A protein has these predicted regions:
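Interaction-mediating elements
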Residues: 1-126
Length: 126
């Protein structure tokens, strides 16, 4: 189930987003022990001028000041320690493979509760 959703402005120097998504999936699988088939990673590019921080907009993804926005969705049975490890694994992987400074990432984790997830045609309980 883990979902990792990444948003950024377009990069001035093109990145191989498909390859980065594969690497993040592999790194997260290795860090969490979760099989790759259960991990979903997406990357949405924001339109130039559609991301403001302190009222300042940018056309391209800067090295600082407009962090990449990452939202993780995990089942609520993970411990606080596991969640912290997973967040760090995503930060390390994204920074390394996308060549983005780790201090220019904002990662938020939300927890999905048993009975509040619909997948593969049915409600999921754990």
């Amino acid at each position: 189930m883990p979902f990792i959703h990444i948003k950024s402005l377009p990069f001035e120097q093109q990145r191989d987003i498909s390859r980065i998504l594969q690497r993040i999936t592999e790194d997260f699988s290795n860090a969490s022990g979760i099989e790759k088939q259960h991990i979903t990673v997406t990357w949405n590019l924001l339109s130039a001028g559609h991301y403001a921080v302190a009222g300042e907009v940018c056309d391209d993804q800067p090295e600082s000041g407009h962090p990449l926005l990452v939202e993780m969705l995990l089942p609520d049975f993970n411990s606080s320690e596991e969640i912290a490890e997973y967040i760090q694994a995503v930060a390390d992987s994204l920074s390394r493979h996308a060549q983005v400074p780790i201090n220019n990432l904002f990662i938020n984790c939300r927890l999905a509760r048993s009975g509040q997830v619909f997948d593969a045609g049915e409600m999921v309980h754990w």
